[in-house]
Design a protein with these regions (language model features):
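An anion/pyrophosphate-binding glycine-rich loop and adjacent beta-alpha core
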Residues: 87-89, 96-204
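Glycine-rich loop(s) and the adjacent beta-strand/alpha-helix scaffold that form part
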Residues: 36-110, 304-307
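Short Gly/Pro-enriched turn/cap motifs at secondary-structure boundaries
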Residues: 77-79, 118-123, 154, 247-251, ...
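A glycine-rich dinucleotide-binding beta-alpha-beta segment and adjacent secondary-structure elements
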Residues: 19, 208-291
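Glycine-rich phosphate/pyrophosphate-binding beta-alpha loops
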Residues: 105-110, 147-150, 249-255, 283-298
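Short glycine-enriched, charge-decorated loop/helix-capping segments at active-site entrances
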Residues: 73-76, 181-182, 291-296
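Helical element adjacent to the flavin cofactor pocket in flavoenzyme catalytic cores
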Residues: 1-47, 87, 91-93, 258-259
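Internal hydrophobic alpha-helix adjacent to the cofactor/substrate pocket in enzyme cavities
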Residues: 86-96, 202-205, 210-213, 301-316
């Protein structure tokens, strides 16, 4: 944001885009918008409009229509503005969509809120962590694809599982710069000097949790998971205190969206570009197939954002 401001970009905050503006030749030349109190505005451009409005994970109506296998009660990891407005507006003017039924669910979010935060560990990987159900048992390889992981969690009691790790990967602040001891004090994280005490706090059989950790420690030494086929290992879980973080699935990324060309032009239902309309990022579909790989959305927005800008300036 600061870099863009230095380059002369004029941000209009507190606005919601309502529609596109087209000239008499059918080219998109701007947008209409309203502010928080309902005042109406028009913004025009000589080069066109780039939609970068994100996905629709927070739009339950659109979500359920596109992916009815998801329950309306499911929360999302995303910010409240991920309501698919760009898709709604563009399709109003004939834009085509693709892959709208592909919605990715993140397996290990905060129960109830869907937030990614709230973990005990400083490091974000799973190499030093196991996940257990309410019975204290592992149920999946922790490095599984997200859709496989989610499917496995849904079969567990209550649909809630626990990250289990030791203090070797814990710092005063976690990977989201949250104070770990504060999270413990408010009950977001459980902490104990022994696995038995940790199991007691979680209401699970101590012998089951201890057995799961012992089994994992053997796997780390052998670099082999005979039960589930896990491939990623680093350190055993041996150093007290031990931590448990409740986790549950949360809607994370919508792979479907507007159909675009390789020049980031928004296409109509006949596969032809809508003049002056471009799109990049999660508002588009088809880039990530049926199941996005973690981190690839960054490459998506950087690549197609640049392509969209170049195409708009060139009036492609």
């Amino acid at each position: 944001y600061q870099s863009a401001v230095k380059q002369g970009v004029n941000f209009k905050l507190g606005m919601r885009v309502q529609d596109l503006i087209l000239n008499d030749k059918g080219r998109v030349i701007g947008v209409t918008a309203t502010d928080k109190v309902g005042n109406k505005y028009e913004f025009t451009s000589k080069d066109g409009v780039i939609l970068a409005t994100g996905g629709y994970s927070q739009n339950k109506e659109m979500r359920q229509k596109s992916a009815p296998h998801l329950t309306p009660e499911m929360v999302s990891t995303n910010q409240p503005g991920a309501t698919g407005d760009g898709i709604v507006i563009a399709t109003r003017h004939g834009a085509d969509t693709t892959g709208m039924n592909y919605v990715q669910v993140y397996p290990l979010a905060t129960p109830g809120t869907g937030a990614l935060q709230g973990r005990a560990r400083k490091m974000s990987g799973l190499d030093d962590v196991i996940d257990v159900n309410k019975n204290g048992e592992r149920f999946v390889k922790e490095d599984a694809r997200r859709d496989e992981f989610v499917a496995a969690i849904k079969k567990q009691p209550g649909g809630v599982v626990y990250d289990i790790n030791d203090s070797s990967i814990v710092k005063p602040l976690n990977s989201f710069n949250e104070d770990v001891e504060t999270l413990v004090s408010i009950g977001r994280i459980y902490k104990a000097d022994s696995l038995a005490d940790l199991a007691k706090q979680l209401g699970m059989p101590a012998d089951k949790l201890e057995a799961s950790v012992a089994e994992f420690n053997k796997m780390v030494e052998a670099k082999n998971d005979p039960k589930f086929g896990r491939k990623l290992f680093d350190r055993p879980i041996v150093k007290p205190p031990f931590y448990a973080t409740p986790r549950a699935p949360s809607i994370h990324h919508t792979m479907g969206g507007l159909q675009i060309s390789t020049n980031a032009q928004v296409l109509d239902k006949k596969g032809k570009p809508i003049p002056g309309l471009y799109a990049a990022g999660e508002v588009t579909g088809g880039i990530h197939g049926s199941n996005r790989l973690g981190g690839n959305a960054t490459a998506d927005v950087l690549t197609f954002g640049r392509i969209a800008a170049k195409s708009a300036v060139a009036h492609k």
